[in-house]
């Protein structure tokens, strides 16, 4: 049974999410501020975090920053703010997805399932045979779910890994933002520009020696992104 931590200072929201996720067969742990969330994560195996932004003591953004120093579990941020700047900030600190309040519980449940599928796949470390994809010094072992650049291990979130794998598998092919979003999120790309752009920037920061002059992940202006054939 997969365990989900729900963190929000509004106890009614926590209870409502608990009901929906429990009905789907998930074990739900609860916290009511960022400090409590960190403590729960420290003492339990958690597979996904749903966390609110505005909370006392330690808010969701600062908590996410701290969590990302230790863990790559999927993080879905909840916020009453719907402005693009707030979404960018949430993704910048390491969140994988962003849901605006008020939200449809069925939509949140669907996003939880989607994120967990990626995380479960990324966490599968049993190798039966090699499935290696390489672009110069960039190597992806898709059986072990490992990425190295010039022999150095690179730690990616599940979303980042799947975007990079898509591009490396199709070296030389340009993918539009909508194509990337629909391939990875498996849903219609509506307002996907910011989400994809932030994840692309994070990938570059991790795989490129100089993200401003990328060696691997190139932008084709007005079209999309690609991994150049090496």
Label the model's feature ranges:
Residues 32-36, 59-62, 86:
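Acidic catalytic/metal-coordinating carboxylates
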Residues 12-23:
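Charged docking surfaces used in two-component/phosphorelay signaling
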Residues 3, 114-174, 178:
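Short, Lys/Arg-enriched segments at the junction into DNA-binding effector domains
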Residues 130, 155, 200, 204-230:
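DNA-binding patch around the recognition helix
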Residues 25-32, 40:
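Short hydrophobic/Thr-rich beta-strand motif most characteristic of the beta2 strand and flanking loop
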Residues 44-51:
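Active-site beta3 strand of CheY-like receiver
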Residues 53-55:
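Receiver (REC) domain active-site loop signature in two-component systems and cognate sites
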Residues 65, 69, 73-134:
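Basic, amphipathic DNA-recognition helix from helix-turn-helix-like DNA-binding domains
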């Amino acid at each position: 049974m997969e365990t989900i931590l729900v963190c929000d200072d509004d106890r009614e929201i926590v209870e409502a999410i608990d009901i929906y996720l429990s009905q789907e067969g998930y074990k739900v742990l609860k916290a009511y501020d960022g400090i409590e969330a960190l403590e729960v994560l420290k003492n339990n195996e958690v597979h996904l975090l749903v966390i609110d932004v505005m909370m006392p003591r330690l808010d969701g953004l600062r908590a996410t920053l701290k969590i990302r120093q230790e863990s790559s579990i999927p993080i879905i941020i909840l916020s009453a703010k719907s402005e693009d700047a707030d979404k960018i900030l949430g993704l910048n600190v390491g969140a994988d997805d962003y849901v605006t309040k008020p939200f449809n519980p069925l939509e949140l449940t669907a996003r939880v399932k989607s994120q967990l599928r990626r995380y479960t796949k990324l966490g599968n470390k049993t190798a039966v045979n090699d499935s290696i994809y390489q672009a110069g010094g960039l190597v992806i072992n898709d059986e072990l779910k490992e990425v190295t650049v010039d022999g150095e291990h690179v730690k990616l979130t599940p979303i980042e890994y799947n975007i990079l794998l898509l591009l490396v598998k199709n070296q030389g092919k340009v993918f539009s933002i909508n194509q990337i979003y629909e391939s990875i999120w498996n849903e219609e790309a509506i307002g996907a520009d910011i989400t994809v752009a932030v994840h692309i920037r994070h990938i570059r920061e991790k795989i490129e020696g100089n993200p401003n002059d990328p060696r691997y992940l190139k932008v084709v202006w007005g079209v999309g992104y690609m991994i150049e054939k090496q």
